């Protein structure tokens, strides 16, 4: 039986997944993220008509981390011809950890997709080439999408990531050695870590990502990207948005999704909904444990899946 989507349903779902808290692990390789309270739990849903449903800590902001990779790709699609992007980054799932160097070496410095670290670094490198102030431009984009003028980067998280960035620097220099990186590595890393350190709430994320449910149009009706590009990003999220847990997520949830190690996940029901969940404890793939379970329950209760 299909259940009506409302706040009470979302509250009920959070109640059901709350016992999972304590079974995952908060990301601790970024010291500033390790301090986040592990008991946080939130969900927000925004319809293409702008109707909002929420439960839990849905207005509390957190570090969106790799969810920002969708936003940087979106921004790149407005600045480059598509073939220019896909010459430098692929569209295939990686099947390896998101910060792997092994595959990159084997494949001549061309990352598998834009949602793993090497691919996102290439996208940031491309933005660095075309934008005079890429950090400021991203803030303008997300503030417009979310309808919130005070959205900002957490400079402490960005600094913490930059101070522990040896592996990402190695990835960038490896790509540079293959001729797939144009700008100064440290400058691009600063931009990349600021994007990851964007602080947003589930409510703001759900509103911001409506354009992927609404053929590329945001809540105001403005075209962010074309309908075809929105469909293509959803396809990439489906195959590559959940690190090396994309198959598990497709099986359990059945929606395009993008996660971040801050514990957030954004999921899309094309033509209908944008959903954001947050629970900081992660599973072995780096995806929110309780967040994934909440999306699985929601998918079942409202009978929504792309399959």
Swiss-Prot record:
Molecular function as annotated in GO: glutaminase activity
EC number: 3.5.1.2
Keywords: Hydrolase
Gene Ontology process terms (BP): glutamate biosynthetic process; glutamine catabolic process
InterPro entries membership: Beta-lactam/transpept-like, Glutaminase
Catalytic activity line of the entry: L-glutamine + H2O = L-glutamate + NH4(+)
PANTHER family per the UniProt record, alphabetical: GLUTAMINASE
Similarity comment: family membership: Belongs to the glutaminase family.
Quaternary state and interactors: Homotetramer.
Name of the featured protein: Glutaminase
Organism per entry: Serratia proteamaculans (strain 568)
Encoding gene, per UniProt annotation: glsA
């Amino acid at each position: 039986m299909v259940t009506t989507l409302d706040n009470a349903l979302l509250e009920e779902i959070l109640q059901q997944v709350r016992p999972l808290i304590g079974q995952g692990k908060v990301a601790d390789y970024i010291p500033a993220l390790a301090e986040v309270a592990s008991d946080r739990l939130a969900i927000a849903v925004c319809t293409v008509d702008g109707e909002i449903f929420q439960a839990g800590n849905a207005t509390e902001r957190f570090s969106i981390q790799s969810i920002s990779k969708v936003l940087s790709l979106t921004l790149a699609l407005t600045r480059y011809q598509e073939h220019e992007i896909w010459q430098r980054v692929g569209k295939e799932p990686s099947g390896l950890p998101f910060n792997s160097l092994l595959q990159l070496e084997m494949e001549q410095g061309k990352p598998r997709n834009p949602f793993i670290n090497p691919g996102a670094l290439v996208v940031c490198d491309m933005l660095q080439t075309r934008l005079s102030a890429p950090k400021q431009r991203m803030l303008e984009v997300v503030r417009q999408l979310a309808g919130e003028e005070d959205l900002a980067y957490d400079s402490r998280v960005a600094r913490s990531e930059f101070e522990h960035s040896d592996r990402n620097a190695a990835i960038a220099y490896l790509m540079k050695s293959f001729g797939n990186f144009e700008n100064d590595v440290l400058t691009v890393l600063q931009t990349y870590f600021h994007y990851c350190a964007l602080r947003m709430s589930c409510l703001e994320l759900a509103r911001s990502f409506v354009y992927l449910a609404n053929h590329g149009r945001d809540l105001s009706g403005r075209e962010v990207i074309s309908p075809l590009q929105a469909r293509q990003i959803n396809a990439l999220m489906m195959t590559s948005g959940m690190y090396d847990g994309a198959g598990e997520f497709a099986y359990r949830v059945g929606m395009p999704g993008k996660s971040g190690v801050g514990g957030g996940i954004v999921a899309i029901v094309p033509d209908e909904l944008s959903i954001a969940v947050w629970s900081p404890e992660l599973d072995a793939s780096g995806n929110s444990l309780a967040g994934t379970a909440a999306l699985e329950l929601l998918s079942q209760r409202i009978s929504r899946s792309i399959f």
